[in-house]
């Protein structure tokens, strides 16, 4: 997947962990899921990577670093186009893990890690954002969108992961879609990837 062997090695570590934890997620329940790697997956990662390479955004915002799986794809693409990824995470232990992995991959120079409440961190940043990945708890999609929408550049893109899954969050994703549709200057589409 990745041309840089250091990035590829870290990606393989993430994939190994994801396979190991897949069964564990079902047994641990909702609370235990937060300790597991919940990756966007290879297909979505490739799609995001390609989209960034094609659109060449300068400021990329990732809302929900988690353990850094999707951050790896974003940062590798950002390095190629000399862009910056601002990545937001609430849990310090997740951010520490992501920092370590992305440093090992040699991508730290294209990352700005920020720790805290996503809405507060978005509010504190002047923008603009050229590309945004929303990949956090679905109950936060609308508040985050409301905070970042005024800071979205004219050609900006927002990618929101897991719009169909998990089933228990579909009310939140429906509210998010309805909120986006109220903005006449935005276009939206649902893609079934991954």
Predicted segment positions?
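A short alpha-helical cap/connector motif
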Residues: 1-133, 138-159, 163-194
């Amino acid at each position: 997947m990745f041309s840089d062997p250091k990035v590829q090695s870290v990606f393989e570590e993430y994939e190994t962990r994801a396979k190991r934890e897949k069964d564990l997620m079902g047994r641990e329940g909702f609370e235990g899921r937060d300790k597991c790697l919940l990756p966007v997956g290879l297909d979505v990662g490739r799609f995001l990577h390609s989209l960034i390479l094609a659109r060449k955004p300068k400021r990329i915002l990732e809302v929900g670093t988690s353990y850094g799986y999707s951050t790896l794809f974003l940062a590798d693409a950002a390095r190629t186009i000399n862009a910056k990824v601002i990545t937001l995470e609430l849990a310090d232990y997740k951010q520490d893990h992501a920092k370590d992995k992305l440093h090992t991959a040699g991508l730290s120079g294209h990352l700005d890690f920020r720790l805290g409440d996503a809405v507060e961190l978005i509010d504190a940043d002047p923008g603009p954002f050229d590309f945004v990945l929303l990949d956090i708890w679905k109950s936060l999609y609308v508040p985050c969108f409301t905070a970042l929408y005024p800071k979205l550049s004219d050609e900006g893109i927002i990618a929101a992961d897991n719009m169909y899954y998990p089933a228990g969050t579909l009310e939140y994703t429906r509210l998010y879609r309805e909120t986006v549709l109220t903005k006449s200057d935005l276009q939206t589409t649902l893609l079934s990837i991954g």
